[in-house]
Amino acid sequence: MAYKPSSVFLNGSYWGIHNIREKFDKNYFSENFNADPDNIDHLEYSRTETGTELLIVEGTMSHYNEMIDYLMSNNLNDPAIYAQVVEWMDIDSFIDHLVMTMYCANTSWGHNREWWRPRTENGKWRWLIVDLD
């Protein structure tokens, strides 16, 4: 994720150095992954007034729900079952996400999780690292 440090002044008062970061949106996925911006699924767990909720940022949740139902209903020790899951999700991205979350002792992981996929025949779910402070 690209960022640029900047000095922030509000009404003449210095507020320190802040990092301006790219936003995870359809333009980010288009520019960084060459994904069609109108054909992505982007989901996030976020805090809302009623608690932490799974929200649709772009696209739909149907492919994700299908994958989760499959995971919950099948035994991943079966090589054929595991092979199907590998077709749906980028396993390395998921592992990287878990390792980074644990290594950084990210305490806000419960409400700061995002993942996305290009809505194509071979589009796999990939996880994003957000808000490690």
Q: Language-model features: where?
A:
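Short beta-strand or tight-loop elements
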Residues: K4, D96, H111
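Zinc-dependent metallopeptidase catalytic helix centered on the HExxH motif
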Residues: N11, M100-D133
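A broad, low-specificity signal marking well-ordered, structured residues that form hydrophobic/aromatic
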Residues: S6, H18-N19, I40-D41, R113, ...
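Short, well-structured beta-strand/strand-turn elements
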Residues: M1-S7
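ATP-dependent phospho-/nucleotidyl transfer catalytic cores
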Residues: S13-W15, N19-N106, R119-T120
